[in-house]
Protein backbone atom coordinates (compact mmCIF):
# COMPACT_ATOMS: atom_id res chain seq x y z
CA UNK A 1 0.00 0.00 0.00
CA UNK A 2 2.90 2.37 0.62
CA UNK A 3 3.56 2.75 -3.11
CA UNK A 4 0.19 4.44 -3.37
CA UNK A 5 1.91 7.66 -2.29
CA UNK A 6 3.79 7.62 -5.61
CA UNK A 7 0.57 8.05 -7.58
CA UNK A 8 0.46 11.77 -7.09
CA UNK A 9 3.81 13.38 -6.22
CA UNK A 10 2.14 16.80 -6.32
CA UNK A 11 0.11 16.75 -3.11
CA UNK A 12 -1.24 20.27 -3.35
CA UNK A 13 -4.85 19.13 -3.54
CA UNK A 14 -4.59 15.51 -2.37
CA UNK A 15 -3.80 13.87 0.96
CA UNK A 16 -3.68 10.13 1.67
CA UNK A 17 -4.19 8.53 5.07
CA UNK A 18 -3.49 4.81 5.30
CA UNK A 19 -3.89 2.46 8.25
CA UNK A 20 -3.48 -1.25 7.48
CA UNK A 21 -5.89 -1.78 4.57
CA UNK A 22 -7.99 1.33 5.22
CA UNK A 23 -7.44 4.28 2.92
CA UNK A 24 -8.82 7.80 3.26
CA UNK A 25 -8.36 10.33 0.48
CA UNK A 26 -8.78 14.03 1.23
CA UNK A 27 -9.38 16.24 -1.80
CA UNK A 28 -9.28 20.04 -1.64
CA UNK A 29 -10.57 22.37 -4.32
CA UNK A 30 -11.24 26.05 -4.85
CA UNK A 31 -14.93 25.24 -5.11
CA UNK A 32 -17.26 22.24 -5.00
CA UNK A 33 -17.12 21.43 -8.71
CA UNK A 34 -13.34 21.61 -8.91
CA UNK A 35 -13.02 19.36 -5.86
CA UNK A 36 -15.30 16.74 -7.45
CA UNK A 37 -13.38 16.96 -10.72
CA UNK A 38 -10.06 16.42 -8.92
CA UNK A 39 -11.56 13.58 -6.88
CA UNK A 40 -12.81 11.71 -9.95
CA UNK A 41 -9.43 12.11 -11.63
CA UNK A 42 -7.72 10.79 -8.50
CA UNK A 43 -10.12 7.85 -8.22
CA UNK A 44 -9.26 6.82 -11.77
CA UNK A 45 -5.56 6.89 -10.92
CA UNK A 46 -6.18 4.86 -7.76
CA UNK A 47 -8.12 2.30 -9.74
CA UNK A 48 -5.31 2.00 -12.30
CA UNK A 49 -2.77 1.64 -9.50
CA UNK A 50 -4.87 -1.14 -7.96
CA UNK A 51 -5.08 -3.05 -11.23
CA UNK A 52 -1.31 -2.81 -11.65
CA UNK A 53 -0.81 -4.35 -8.20
CA UNK A 54 -3.39 -7.14 -8.55
CA UNK A 55 -5.55 -5.27 -6.11
CA UNK A 56 -9.05 -3.83 -6.16
CA UNK A 57 -11.04 -1.22 -4.29
CA UNK A 58 -14.62 -2.08 -3.37
CA UNK A 59 -17.00 0.60 -4.62
CA UNK A 60 -19.83 -0.47 -2.30
CA UNK A 61 -17.51 -0.15 0.70
CA UNK A 62 -16.20 3.23 -0.44
CA UNK A 63 -18.10 6.28 0.79
CA UNK A 64 -17.82 9.97 -0.06
CA UNK A 65 -18.41 12.96 2.16
CA UNK A 66 -18.52 16.64 1.35
CA UNK A 67 -17.17 19.21 3.81
CA UNK A 68 -18.62 22.52 2.69
CA UNK A 69 -19.71 25.64 4.53
CA UNK A 70 -22.74 26.19 2.33
CA UNK A 71 -25.54 23.80 1.48
CA UNK A 72 -25.01 22.12 -1.89
CA UNK A 73 -28.39 21.27 -3.47
CA UNK A 74 -26.97 18.96 -6.14
CA UNK A 75 -24.36 16.32 -5.38
CA UNK A 76 -22.22 15.71 -8.45
CA UNK A 77 -21.37 12.02 -8.95
CA UNK A 78 -18.12 10.33 -7.99
CA UNK A 79 -17.12 7.09 -9.67
CA UNK A 80 -14.80 4.23 -8.74
CA UNK A 81 -14.22 1.51 -11.29
CA UNK A 82 -17.31 2.66 -13.17
CA UNK A 83 -19.56 2.47 -10.12
CA UNK A 84 -21.20 5.50 -8.57
CA UNK A 85 -20.22 6.22 -4.97
CA UNK A 86 -22.71 7.13 -2.27
CA UNK A 87 -22.57 10.55 -0.63
CA UNK A 88 -22.84 10.31 3.15
CA UNK A 89 -23.34 12.80 5.97
CA UNK A 90 -21.57 10.51 8.46
CA UNK A 91 -18.71 8.06 8.00
CA UNK A 92 -17.17 5.72 10.56
CA UNK A 93 -13.40 5.64 10.06
CA UNK A 94 -11.00 3.85 12.41
CA UNK A 95 -13.60 3.79 15.16
CA UNK A 96 -14.51 7.47 14.93
CA UNK A 97 -17.76 8.75 13.44
CA UNK A 98 -17.02 11.83 11.35
CA UNK A 99 -19.89 14.06 10.28
CA UNK A 100 -19.81 16.50 7.38
CA UNK A 101 -20.27 19.51 9.67
CA UNK A 102 -17.44 18.41 12.00
CA UNK A 103 -19.71 18.91 15.00
CA UNK A 104 -18.81 15.45 16.38
CA UNK A 105 -22.28 14.99 17.89
CA UNK A 106 -22.84 11.59 16.18
CA UNK A 107 -19.49 10.35 17.52
CA UNK A 108 -20.12 11.59 21.06
CA UNK A 109 -23.59 10.01 21.01
CA UNK A 110 -22.03 6.76 19.81
CA UNK A 111 -19.33 6.56 22.49
CA UNK A 112 -21.86 7.55 25.15
CA UNK A 113 -24.10 4.60 24.26
CA UNK A 114 -21.12 2.27 23.93
CA UNK A 115 -19.65 3.20 27.32
CA UNK A 116 -23.06 3.20 28.99
CA UNK A 117 -23.50 -0.39 27.80
CA UNK A 118 -20.19 -1.33 29.43
CA UNK A 119 -21.28 0.33 32.68
CA UNK A 120 -24.46 -1.78 32.63
CA UNK A 121 -22.32 -4.91 32.22
CA UNK A 122 -20.15 -3.81 35.16
CA UNK A 123 -23.28 -3.56 37.31
CA UNK A 124 -23.84 -7.28 36.81
CA UNK A 125 -20.59 -8.26 38.50
CA UNK A 126 -20.88 -6.22 41.68
CA UNK A 127 -23.37 -5.93 44.53
CA UNK A 128 -23.66 -4.36 47.96
CA UNK A 129 -22.25 -7.44 49.73
CA UNK A 130 -20.79 -9.50 46.89
CA UNK A 131 -18.96 -9.32 43.59
CA UNK A 132 -15.83 -7.75 42.18
CA UNK A 133 -13.68 -5.59 44.45
CA UNK A 134 -13.50 -1.80 44.03
CA UNK A 135 -9.84 -2.16 42.99
CA UNK A 136 -10.73 -4.47 40.09
CA UNK A 137 -13.74 -2.36 39.12
CA UNK A 138 -11.54 0.72 39.03
CA UNK A 139 -9.08 -1.17 36.83
CA UNK A 140 -11.90 -2.18 34.45
CA UNK A 141 -12.99 1.44 34.17
CA UNK A 142 -9.49 2.76 33.55
CA UNK A 143 -8.52 0.02 31.09
CA UNK A 144 -11.77 -0.39 29.13
CA UNK A 145 -14.32 2.37 29.64
CA UNK A 146 -12.11 5.43 29.95
CA UNK A 147 -9.99 4.77 26.80
CA UNK A 148 -13.19 4.24 24.80
CA UNK A 149 -14.70 7.38 26.31
CA UNK A 150 -11.71 9.53 25.34
CA UNK A 151 -10.94 7.89 21.99
CA UNK A 152 -10.24 10.53 19.36
CA UNK A 153 -10.53 13.36 21.87
CA UNK A 154 -7.73 15.26 20.16
CA UNK A 155 -10.24 15.85 17.34
CA UNK A 156 -13.44 16.52 19.29
CA UNK A 157 -12.03 18.18 22.42
CA UNK A 158 -13.48 21.59 21.46
CA UNK A 159 -16.97 20.10 21.66
CA UNK A 160 -16.51 19.79 25.43
CA UNK A 161 -16.85 23.55 25.57
CA UNK A 162 -20.52 22.88 25.01
CA UNK A 163 -22.12 22.12 28.37
CA UNK A 164 -24.48 19.51 26.91
CA UNK A 165 -21.67 17.34 25.55
CA UNK A 166 -19.51 17.65 28.65
CA UNK A 167 -22.39 16.80 30.94
CA UNK A 168 -23.26 13.76 28.86
CA UNK A 169 -19.75 12.28 28.93
CA UNK A 170 -19.15 13.22 32.56
CA UNK A 171 -22.30 11.27 33.41
CA UNK A 172 -20.53 8.08 32.33
CA UNK A 173 -17.57 8.71 34.64
CA UNK A 174 -19.90 9.71 37.46
CA UNK A 175 -21.89 6.48 37.15
CA UNK A 176 -18.69 4.44 37.05
CA UNK A 177 -17.26 6.18 40.12
CA UNK A 178 -20.38 5.56 42.21
CA UNK A 179 -20.52 1.96 41.01
CA UNK A 180 -16.87 1.32 41.89
CA UNK A 181 -17.24 2.58 45.46
CA UNK A 182 -20.86 1.54 45.94
CA UNK A 183 -21.97 4.98 47.14
CA UNK A 184 -25.27 6.81 46.81
CA UNK A 185 -26.11 9.17 43.94
CA UNK A 186 -26.13 12.05 46.39
CA UNK A 187 -22.39 11.61 47.07
CA UNK A 188 -20.45 14.54 45.53
CA UNK A 189 -18.69 13.30 42.41
CA UNK A 190 -15.68 15.57 42.94
CA UNK A 191 -14.92 13.81 46.22
CA UNK A 192 -15.24 10.36 44.62
CA UNK A 193 -12.90 11.32 41.79
CA UNK A 194 -10.29 12.40 44.34
CA UNK A 195 -10.59 9.07 46.18
CA UNK A 196 -10.21 7.13 42.90
CA UNK A 197 -7.45 9.43 41.63
CA UNK A 198 -9.51 10.39 38.58
CA UNK A 199 -9.51 13.79 36.94
CA UNK A 200 -12.65 15.39 35.46
CA UNK A 201 -13.04 14.50 31.79
CA UNK A 202 -12.51 18.03 30.52
CA UNK A 203 -9.00 17.83 32.01
CA UNK A 204 -8.35 14.32 30.66
CA UNK A 205 -9.42 14.86 27.05
Located regions from the model:
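Short linear motifs embedded in intrinsically disordered, charge-biased segments
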Residues: 134, 161-205
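Basic, alpha-helical interaction scaffolds
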Residues: 83-156
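Catalytic palm subdomain of template-directed nucleic-acid polymerases
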Residues: 23-48, 69, 103, 160
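A glycine-rich phosphate-binding loop feature that marks nucleotide/adenosyl-phosphate handling sites
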Residues: 22, 58-70, 139-140, 165-168, ...
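Residue-level recognition of alpha-helical structural elements
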Residues: 32-35, 104, 130-137, 158-165, ...
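Short, conserved micro-motifs composed of acidic
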Residues: 41, 56-89
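Active-site palm subdomain of RNA-directed nucleic acid polymerases
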Residues: 1-26
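Hydrophobic packing residues in well-ordered alpha-helices of helical domains and bundles
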Residues: 16, 36-39, 43, 57, ...
